[in-house]
Amino acid sequence: MTNSIEQAWDLAKQRFAAVGVDVDAALTRLDTLPVSMHCWQGDDVTGFEDPDGVLTGGIQATGNYPGKARNATELRSDLELALALIPGPKRLNLHAIYLESDTSVARNKIEPRHFSHWVAWAKKHQLGLDFNPSCFSHPLSADGFTLSHADPEIRQFWIEHCQASRRISAYFGEQLGTPSVMNIWIPDGMKDTPIDRLAPRQRLLSALDEVISEKLNPAHHIDAVESKLFGIGAESYTVGSNEFYMGYAASRQTALCLDAGHFHPTEVISDKISSAMLYVPRLLLHVSRPVRWDSDHVVLLDDETQAIASEIIRHNLFDRVHIGLDFFDASINRIAAWVIGTRNMKKALLRALLEPTDMLRQLELRGDYTARLALLEEQKSLPWQAIWEGYCQRNDVPVDARWLDAVREYEQQILSQR
């Protein structure tokens, strides 16, 4: 470490030790908590299936910042820079539309070989991979229904797509030695008030059971399902509601995905974690930033991001909660978006690990809510930034906003040529 950072580090460790926090133990734990970065920030959820395709499914990437990745080589290059600017363990989350093939491949015919380059790249960079079927931006999803579609042939197409995706996910886990979390999200819903809310959910229930019917090694693959309140064009009814997927995950013992932007604006997923963990074996978190709706803004180090991290740490949910990010902002440098959001998630985890939780819990058990509030607020002023800077330097990444210099240089030399 540089002298000034080392001095600040030593003083900060003393401050935390005074309130019973072991900084070294906290950093050891932090190094076991990977954050899964989402590949789709790099190209505005376009994928490689149809570069001129239109994004559908009630989601939007707004903006037109130059330098968008146009193929797998460019996307991996951009990711490599972002990964080099973020300390600690990371994973990469892929969608099915990021396959690589010299010929057109129907989505229900995708195979592990179409993702072999991603696996080789992940091995090189010591990354785990996660996966998602892509049930949007496709002619057979154009009317707003996929796994709950009333047409059995269309429904079967999407069932087969999800089944193929599970095999790819298991391939990731087997090849990389760490389980791939495969999350199923579908856009199915209606713009206006439906007459029959039940039948689409019955079809979805049956379709999901068929999707997960093939037994896969849990050391290689984990199933997750994700709810949503509404989307553009599906404002009045969403088939895969919170209640539907909570019941499904609990009854089938799959993982449940909680997306920070998929609930009413007055709801927060940090308050849902402890309840859900009583009924489901695992949680997948999509940490995002909804601004008045599921806008998928870049994650900030704000109250909710911190609350999410604190819930994981306070309740020792390290082995049951998988942390992923889900945002896509096309109005700013896309590499910077990855770096900002992922570093903020890691900062939140570090701050949670540096909290004197045992002390605060004892105050709560004694009913001393005055001291609990006082100390909870005072600990926010403890010098966690000095520990963060030391952690960055230990991991050979820029300590502060100097990472932006590397992004600007890359933008000038590489992105500006696209």
UniProtKB/Swiss-Prot annotation:
Cellular component, GO, one term: cytoplasm
Molecular function as annotated in GO: L-rhamnose isomerase activity; manganese ion binding
Cofactor note: Binds 1 Mn(2+) ion per subunit.
Pfam families per record: RhaA
Pathway named in the protein's UniProt entry: Carbohydrate degradation; L-rhamnose degradation; glycerone phosphate from L-rhamnose: step 1/3
Keywords: Cytoplasm, Isomerase, Manganese, Metal-binding, Rhamnose metabolism
UniProt keyword Isomerase, yes or no: yes
Superkingdom in the source lineage: Bacteria
Reaction it catalyzes: L-rhamnopyranose = L-rhamnulose
Localization, UniProt: Cytoplasm
EC number(s) recorded for this UniProt protein: 5.3.1.14
Entries under SUPFAM superfamilies matching the protein: Xylose isomerase-like
Top EC category: isomerase
Binding site for Mn(2+): 262, 294, 296
Cofactor needs: Mn(2+)
GO biological process per UniProt: L-lyxose metabolic process; rhamnose catabolic process
InterPro entries per the UniProt record, alphabetical: L-rhamnose_isomerase (IPR050337), Rhamnose_isomerase (IPR009308), Xyl_isomerase-like_sf (IPR036237)
Record function comment: Catalyzes the interconversion of L-rhamnose and L-rhamnulose.
Binding partners and assembly: Homotetramer.
Family: Belongs to the rhamnose isomerase family.
Identification of the protein by name: L-rhamnose isomerase
Annotated gene: rhaA
